[in-house]
Amino acid sequence: GRPVIIAISTNDALGINLQNIGKLMVMKHIYFVPFGQDDAAKKPNSCVADMTKIAETVEYALAKEQIQPVLL
């Protein structure tokens, strides 16, 4: 299959959505743009992808590899 690239930006990544993100991370052909907490003090469950890494993530995905580190 063709790769699917996901760049998350959500206020609930480390809440109830963590389960869904985890399921996607182990699926074949699904690749994540590296992401991390954007404001741990004010929004402890919030994560956002490093949008400057989209092109590099696509290059890796086309080679069937997940860019590392995926968690920032």
Residue ranges and their predicted role:
Residues 27:
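Flexible glycine-/small-residue-enriched beta->alpha junction loops
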Residues 20:
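Conserved binding-pocket/active-site segment within a compact domain
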Residues 31-72:
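Glycine-rich phosphate/pyrophosphate-binding loop and the adjoining helix
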Residues 1-17:
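Helix-loop-strand module that forms the ligand-binding subsite of alpha/beta enzymes
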Residues 3, 30-31:
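Residue-level detector of anion-binding/catalytic polar loops
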